[in-house]
């Protein structure tokens, strides 16, 4: 796997001829602060792909600055290059996100009303739903597939003795929720619901805007973590990259959720920031 980053002071020749620099596991682009135009972005993406093809690699982590170059990253995606973005890890850390909000906002977990927007059941989502249900006052599952989730509702009731609500009422489902955990609803669908105006909405897939004029809450689209062991983070990576991306890339995803959570606990991973469009907590 390679890391892709900007150059602090690219020389004129490198910029003119789009010369990429390779240092160990880092691909350094001949750009600094400027926004890339379409032609240059495509040339850099093509040259990046050639390096990755030679190394038989199709997964990369991009720096914070390169994330601000959508033309370049879109071209990488179009060439089937996987960009690690921390979204898989964000879903894994769903309950820890609830814990973090509870701590920062000084609201006890047992007083929280949480709605979870979800249409697809996975081992990860089931684990987090049960964890949230055990610790929060009220949990609503908002879904278009009520019958599918009724089975899960009965399973949680039988095994944990906890009642959750399965609903798809656009007028009432989200009207009293302190926290809305959006696992997989797209923006168009989410905006059809009546949302509590002071709610904190956590969008696992990111890049969602709430169009309600009366909404005064927070729409979280990104996050950052802290890790106990920072062997993966040399000085350059510590400054230029998001820890969440590097940590996600280190994880083996095809293993039982219990094993994943055991590693997260051992590494003392915790949420340290949640980022909205114009604010953070």
Language-model features: where?
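N-terminal basic/disordered segments at the start of proteins
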Residues: 1-23
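Phosphate/diphosphate ligand-binding glycine-rich loop within oxidoreductases
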Residues: 46-92
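Rossmann-like adenosine-cofactor binding region
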Residues: 162-228
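Well-ordered, non-membrane alpha-helical segments in soluble/globular domains
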Residues: 38-51, 95-98, 125-129
């Amino acid at each position: 796997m390679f890391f892709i980053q900007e150059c602090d002071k690219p020389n004129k020749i490198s910029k003119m001829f789009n010369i990429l620099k390779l240092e160990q596991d880092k691909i350094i682009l001949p750009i600094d602060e400027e926004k890339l135009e379409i032609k240059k972005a495509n040339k850099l993406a093509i040259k990046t792909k050639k390096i990755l093809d030679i190394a038989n690699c199709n997964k990369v982590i991009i720096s914070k600055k390169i994330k601000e170059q959508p033309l370049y990253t879109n071209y990488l995606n179009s060439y089937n290059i996987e960009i690690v973005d921390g979204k898989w890890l964000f879903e894994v850390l769903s309950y820890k996100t609830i814990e973090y909000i509870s701590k920062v906002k000084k609201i006890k977990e047992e007083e929280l009303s949480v709605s979870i927007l979800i249409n697809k059941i996975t081992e990860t989502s089931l684990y987090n739903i049960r964890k949230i249900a055990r610790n929060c006052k009220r949990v609503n599952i908002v879904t278009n597939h009520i019958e599918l989730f009724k089975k899960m509702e009965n399973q949680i009731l039988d095994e944990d003795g906890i009642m959750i609500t399965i609903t798809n009422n656009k007028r009432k489902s989200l009207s009293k929720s302190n926290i809305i955990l959006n696992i997989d609803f797209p923006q168009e669908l989410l905006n059809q619901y009546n949302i509590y105006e002071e709610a904190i909405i956590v969008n696992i897939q990111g890049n969602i805007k709430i169009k309600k004029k009366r909404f005064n809450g927070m729409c979280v689209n990104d996050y950052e973590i802290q890790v106990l062991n920072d062997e993966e983070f040399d000085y350059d990576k510590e400054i230029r990259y998001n820890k969440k991306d590097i940590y996600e890339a280190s994880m083996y995803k095809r293993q039982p959720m219990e094993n994943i959570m055991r590693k997260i606990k051992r590494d003392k991973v915790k949420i340290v920031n949640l980022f909205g469009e114009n604010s953070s907590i």
